[in-house]
From Swiss-Prot:
Name of the protein this chain belongs to: Peptidyl-tRNA hydrolase
Biological source species: Bartonella bacilliformis (strain ATCC 35685 / KC583 / Herrer 020/F12,63)
General function of this protein: Hydrolyzes ribosome-free peptidyl-tRNAs (with 1 or more amino acids incorporated), which drop off the ribosome during protein synthesis, or as a result of ribosome stalling.
Cellular component GO terms, alphabetical: cytoplasm
Main location: cytoplasm
Record GO biological process: protein quality control for misfolded or incompletely synthesized proteins; rescue of stalled ribosome
Site (Stabilizes the basic form of H active site to accept a proton): D91
Amino acid sequence: MLLIAGLGNPGSHYQNNRHNIGFMAVDAIHEAFSFSPWSKKFQAEVSNGLINGEKILLIKPQTFMNLSGQAIGEALRFYKLDLDHLIVFYDELDLPPGTVRVKIGGRSNGHNGIKSIDSHCGNNYHHVRLGIGRPISKELVDQYVLGNFTQSDQKWLSTLLGVIANNVAMLIKGDSNCFMNKISLTMKSQGLQ
């Protein structure tokens, strides 16, 4: 079994925020495959399904971003899963919009959701960083990540979410380089990178 987490903040007020791109990625995966309806467990919304025969638990912590590790830690302990069975999708300021980078382990780079997971679980899991770009001024970071994606963002965003869902099986079988390459080629072929 693998646990695929998307980070974000709960509630309709935050639904379209840049900070919620992790939730959006997991929602796209949920829609692309025959997953169970969302239910509440582990201080999160969860859904079970199969991707290429692999059991998957999708999880969207409902604890707010800064406490995401509580929900993810509960789920890992309940299912007795090691960190190599955890994939986390989240927003990354230091990557251009529509860019994806996957790595195992590493630092939080100031991302409070990742800091929370690292403190509750450790950091040796699959980090899937989804580029949202960065505002011009450092003082505007909070306002930027908690701001909604703009109309001009919608084309690259919808394409990115679709290509993530269509190719997540590569990531699940451990081929993160092919996953990143497929996303990059798709985004570039459509002039979105």
